[in-house]
Amino acid sequence: MGGGNCNPKDFGAAAYWDARYSSPSTGGKGGGGGGFFDWYRSYSALRPLLRACVPTSSQVLMLGCGNSLLSEDMVKDGYQNIVNIDISSVVIEQMKEKHTDIAQLTYMQLDVRDMSFFGDGSFDCIIDKGTLDAMMCGDDAPHGAYKMLAEVARLMRPGGIYMLITYGAPKERLTLLNQVRCHWEVELYIMPATPEYQLKWSNGAAHAMMEKVALTVDGQLPPDYVLKDPESHFIYVCYKSDIVTEDKSMVAGQDDAMSSF
């Protein structure tokens, strides 16, 4: 995540994000409310994978939407129903105002650790571009991250997709994803972030900007795999093949299980 001088421990708190989105530099007071910012990758970079995995008729949930252009760009490309949530009431009001004429977009202030407003199996696709990473910087990490993922699993319809765009390598993120008792089938794609590596990968190949990587049986990168760009972004496409097995005792046990993060 972009750090600047901010304390990463603030990333799980509404107060931090409210202050951030009230700043003129992010389109808040004094800035005309017109600012947009995309963590990691833009829609144009993600479009091939999104269009391949997510039909335009899907019911989509955007986690931690912030003031990203991703949802707007998806609607321009034919997506019909995107619910955007964020812990910051400030940015939600900003985005409601900006997109008041776009009927395909809905905005709600909601904490991803408790999305009980929505019923089980409400969404075909849930997109997370940096939100899990922010949760792992919160005061209640990794417990808060687990609660978020449990909610994601609950909200997904069988056959649905959770698309996680993150800086987290498989050793960290797949271990975290596997704590959820949902039958995930995970595909991993790696996108170089540094321009020099993007150019090296091009060579006219259709997959130049996104490489699908076969994971080992235990869900890790192959031992001989060489990560070309150390600043790469990882995209985990998690398919839900069955209904989550509810076990409330898991929540209390996750802190010990994930204490290595």
Label the model's feature ranges:
Residues P158-T166:
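Conserved beta-strand signature within the Rossmann-like core of class I S-adenosyl-L-methionine
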Residues P142-P158:
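A short glycine-rich, Lys/Arg-flanked "PGG" loop and its adjoining helix->strand segment in the class I
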Residues N7-D10, T26-R47:
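Conserved SAM-binding loop and adjacent beta-strand
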Residues K200-F261:
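Core SAM-dependent methyltransferase catalytic element
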